[in-house]
């Protein structure tokens, strides 16, 4: 009974991972001399990010791929130059922010290439996905099922944190919207009051003017 329940929990855990544990994995070509191409993602504060890129080609083919990882807070997280094969960059986010992984393929010489380009495989792991669970399992002497459950626990905690962040952001936007509506309402009342006051003043002025001319 206990073993079947454990197996069921393991199956549910793996099923959950299929839907929740989604890392960004892309494969694309980047032509030489066409400018920078960036992939954007979002990360919460203090989350580990591991960026793995596999770049095709070989040195001396007249192309040079440079990589740049930066976030919207102005932080640089790596600028590998002339990337060939697999390269990996890891960093921990300083805050809730978006970050860009950018590639630029520079043509340094033609060498008879008609359509110079490089193929790039990009894998971005964030949070629990970025941790080395094989190493954790070996160090803490965990069973596979315990490792899976630990991983699920961390992923669920990250999902909860992200939902809390979205809820707080929604509340902030709602408060800003309500504050703006309140200001617009009072501005409209003030404008109407000014128009009414201006109309009354015009009536009084015209009445006094016509009386001075003995027209009324």
UniProtKB/Swiss-Prot annotation:
InterPro entries: Emp24-like (IPR015720), GOLD_dom (IPR009038)
Highest taxon above the source species: Eukaryota
Signal sequence range: 1-25
Family, as annotated: Belongs to the EMP24/GP25L family.
Stated name of the protein: Endoplasmic reticulum vesicle protein 25
Mode of membrane association: Single-pass type I membrane protein
Function according to Swiss-Prot or TrEMBL: Constituent of COPII-coated endoplasmic reticulum-derived transport vesicles. Required for efficient transport of a subset of secretory proteins to the Golgi. Facilitates retrograde transport from the Golgi to the endoplasmic reticulum.
Keywords: Endoplasmic reticulum, ER-Golgi transport, Golgi apparatus, Membrane, Protein transport, Signal, Transmembrane, Transmembrane helix, Transport
Aminoacyl-tRNA synthetase in keyword set: no
Primary localization: endoplasmic reticulum
Gene responsible for this protein: erv25
Organism expressing this protein natively: Emericella nidulans (strain FGSC A4 / ATCC 38163 / CBS 112.46 / NRRL 194 / M139)
């Amino acid at each position: 009974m206990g073993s079947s329940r454990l197996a069921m929990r393991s199956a549910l855990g793996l099923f959950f991972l299929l839907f929740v544990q989604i890392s960004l994995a892309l494969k694309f070509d980047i032509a030489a001399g066409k400018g920078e191409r960036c992939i954007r993602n979002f990360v919460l504060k203090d989350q580990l990010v591991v960026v793995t890129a596999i770049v095709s080609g070989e040195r001396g083919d007249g192309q040079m791929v440079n990589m740049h990882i930066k976030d919207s807070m102005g932080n640089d997280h790596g600028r590998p130059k002339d990337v060939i094969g697999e390269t990996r960059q890891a960093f921990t986010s300083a805050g809730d922010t978006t970050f860009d992984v950018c590639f630029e393929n520079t043509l340094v010489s033609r060498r008879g290439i008609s359509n110079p380009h490089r193929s790039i495989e990009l894998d971005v792991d964030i949070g629990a996905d970025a941790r080395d669970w094989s190493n954790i399992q070996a160090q803490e002497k965990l069973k596979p099922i315990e490792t899976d459950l630990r991983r699920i626990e961390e992923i669920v905690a990250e999902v909860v944190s992200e939902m809390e962040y979205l809820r707080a952001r929604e509340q902030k936007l709602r408060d800003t919207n309500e504050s703006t509506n309140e200001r617009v309402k009072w501005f409209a009342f003030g404008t109407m009051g000014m128009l009414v006051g201006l109309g009354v003043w015009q009536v009084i002025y015209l009445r006094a003017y016509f009386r001075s001319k003995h027209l009324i």
